[in-house]
């Protein structure tokens, strides 16, 4: 099985897991919505997968600052990361689904 044609997509805790597990691997991409970095998480190498991080600006479950922390860490090691912030809270609105579809189409 080739994983280069696979994308991991996760929401909230699932996004945290997709990011942690997916970025070191040669995947086609990683998408995280309303995710956060696990405590003491850091990247040692440039992520192999292009990454899309999406987050609601009004998320009170996982504050949008978590997206900034993830973006900073991925950027620090030279990773390719796109950010999409939408109005709303801890959810996946249609506009985020559409943004994810655009990301996937470009892979």
Question: What do the PLM-derived regions correspond to, one by one?
Answer:
Residues 9-14, 18:
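Gly/Ala-rich beta-loop-alpha elbow adjacent to hydrolase catalytic centers
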Residues 21-22:
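Aromatic pocket-lining residues of Rossmann-like dinucleotide-binding sites
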């Amino acid at each position: 099985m080739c994983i280069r044609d696979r994308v991991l997509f996760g929401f909230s805790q699932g996004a945290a897991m997709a990011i942690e597990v997916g970025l070191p691997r040669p995947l086609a991409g990683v998408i995280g919505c309303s995710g956060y970095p696990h405590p003491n998480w850091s990247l040692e190498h440039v992520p192999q997968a292009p990454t899309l991080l999406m987050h609601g600006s009004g998320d009170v479950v996982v504050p949008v600052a978590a997206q900034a922390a993830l973006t900073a860490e991925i950027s620090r090691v030279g990773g390719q990361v796109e950010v999409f912030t939408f109005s709303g809270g801890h959810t996946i609105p249609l506009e985020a689904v559409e943004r994810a579809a655009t990301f996937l189409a470009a892979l």
